[in-house]
Amino acid sequence: GANPDLVSFLVKQALLNVAADLKLNAPTPQTKAEWADLMRQAGIKGIHIAERDTQRSKSPKEPDVFVNTWSVEGFLSEGVQPSELGWGTHEKWMPENARTHQAGCGAAIYLMQPGANTRVRTWCPTRGAQYGFLVTHNESISIADYFTVRDAAGTAVYRPTCHYAYHPCNDAVLSLH
């Protein structure tokens, strides 16, 4: 996995690449507002932070044994928390089981179901198209918030949707069953 700072850096680099491909001829942003405006100009609506754990064991998973390649407690904690994601201003609907937070930056929604029970379609270079668990990861919210454009009154007029889609190693998926 990659930590939130590295992911944020990669999103910025990807944005610069997209802006160059679109020939936006924009200078490299220096402020949060400039980064958010460039994201808006590029027309980006969604950011997927996708991870696929491809590690595998030489021996089969034993029955009644929980297997994971990193912290079992951390994995279970992420898996039982409600799914949470940055919610874009272009989204004109919300899932029936979605809720908004009463406090905070206003960039996120959460679903009334655990992340380990929520699948999203995404893409990883190692496997291509895949389904991942929509688990809570702070960078999903901090990135959506960072790239929010607000009007003079402080109302969000642009924000990309951002979520983290995690596909654990196959033995960890079996352990969840």
Map each language-model feature to its residues.
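C-terminal catalytic/substrate-binding lobe primarily of soluble NAD(P)-dependent oxidoreductases
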Residues: 17-177
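Domain-scale recognition of functional cores that engage charged ligands
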Residues: 1-13
